[in-house]
Amino acid sequence: MFDGWAPFTVYAYYSCSPAGITEEEARAAAEGTLTAKQSMAVELEMLLGLLRGASYGAQAQATDLGNFAVVDALAVLCGGYHQLNGDGQGLILVGISTGTLLATNGSIERVSGRFVAPCGCPVVLSAALDNLASFPAPELYHLGATKVMAGPAFDLGVHVSSVNDRTLIVERTFGVAWTCDPVMTSAPAITPAV
């Protein structure tokens, strides 16, 4: 199913008392937890993959285009991406705080429910990018056409512990691929106004 992709698995669990809830209800709760957390888990895996050099079908690590003001960084990514790849497909990945700043000053705009850069590329606001402590300053990434494949959710069974709790674990495997070498840039740290 994930031939040529870099697969990874996301897990979720639900713990409860064995009395008062059926196994089907516990399974539904565990699957609901998985659904709620899987998008951030996929974002985080993509970002960590960029940091550690995991290959997602293209160059392992992003080419660093330099440090710029946030608005200039967006322009550099748009221009650099078209210069390097030229196919006009892909996405720009920014943290929510950086995306909010870009949206507030009109550098990105919402079109049909999604954010778009002036170069026409979709902009994805990533909570995972804001939450990575290893980033000293906001970083912006441009990836080629990106595909995420999700497998079915699997139930790993019910475990009843010695304290009379029941835990149901579910998992789903994902694969991520993009079609060209990623590029990135960083901006000075965003500090809140006093």
Where in this protein do the model-derived segments appear?
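Feature targets compositionally biased, intrinsically disordered low-complexity regions
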Residues: 19, 56, 65, 79, ...
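Generic detector of leucine side chains in alpha-helical contexts
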Residues: 44-51, 65, 74-77, 84, ...
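Sequence/fold signature of self-assembling virion shell proteins
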Residues: 112-194
